[in-house]
A protein has these predicted regions:
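Generic hydrophobic, helix-prone segments enriched in Leu/Val/Ile
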Residues: 1-2, 27, 120, 148-155
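N-terminal accessory alpha/beta regions
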Residues: 1-36
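Non-cleavable N-terminal signal-anchor transmembrane helices
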Residues: 1-5, 133-135, 139, 143, ...
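Residues that form generic nucleotide/phosphate-binding pockets
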Residues: 26, 30, 44, 183
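Short Cys/His-rich Zn2+-coordinating modules
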Residues: 31-44, 66-73
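Short cysteine-rich loop/turn motifs with clustered Cys
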Residues: 42-64, 88
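Glycine- and acidic-residue-rich phosphate-binding/metal-coordinating active-site segment common to enzymes
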Residues: 61-141
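C-terminal, charged low-complexity interaction regions
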Residues: 146-195
Length: 195
């Protein structure tokens, strides 16, 4: 199911009693540092990363929890499990604290279901230095779901996924070059491009 996380409004007080500083302090000094709480909740949330991989990029090792809704802008959700996502250091560093703007918020890795959608486009380009891969959000999606297209573009841009995927793909291509050369001879260029 889809949650409209981008509809949440920024705020500085929680129930008119706790300030954003109070909520940030609860997270920083209790949730992360008190061993009993850390072992029970923080470590459990970290274990939700499938195979230990970051659910944002699918490449890096999940090593920290990130607030999908920034705790400094949305303090009510500072210790809400739905708001805490295990991520790699690169994705955590790339995302800054920002207000979620409807129709252009990045994807929430657990609540925005896109696995069944063919949204990622990969293109192999031959250059002087070799074959490089470029990734983008499929233009076909823009025709069928403009909002999802914009959110996916924001997601790719925010987390620098084109670069991350290009590096990963180039590494994979280089490591498997003998295999691809063999397939090129067997199938020909036209059939190989269809993959």
């Amino acid at each position: 199911s889809r949650h409209n996380w981008s509809a949440f409004q920024p705020h500085t007080m929680v129930n008119k009693t706790l300030s954003k500083e109070d909520m940030c302090d609860i997270y920083d000094s209790k949730f992360v540092k008190v061993e009993r709480i850390k072992n029970k909740y923080y470590d459990h949330l970290m274990s939700l990363a499938n195979t230990g991989k970051c659910p944002i990029c699918g490449i890096g090792q999940a090593s920290t929890l990130d607030h999908y809704l920034a705790k400094t802008i949305y303090p009510t959700y500072a210790v809400t499990p739905y708001n805490l996502v295990p991520v790699c250091k690169d994705c955590n560093f790339a995302k800054s604290d920002s207000i979620m703007i409807p129709d252009s918020a990045p994807l929430h890795p657990y609540y925005d279901e896109v696995d069944s959608i063919n949204w990622l486009k990969a293109q192999l380009i031959e250059r002087d230095e070799g074959i490089v891969a470029e990734f983008s959000v499929s233009q076909d999606l823009q025709k069928s779901d403009v909002c999802l297209y914009q959110r996916l573009k924001r997601h790719m841009d925010l987390y620098h996924l084109n670069k991350a995927y290009a590096i990963q793909a180039t590494t994979e291509l280089a490591e498997n070059l003998p295999f691809w050369k063999k397939k090129y001879k067997e199938w020909g260029e036209k059939n190989l491009r269809r993959i």
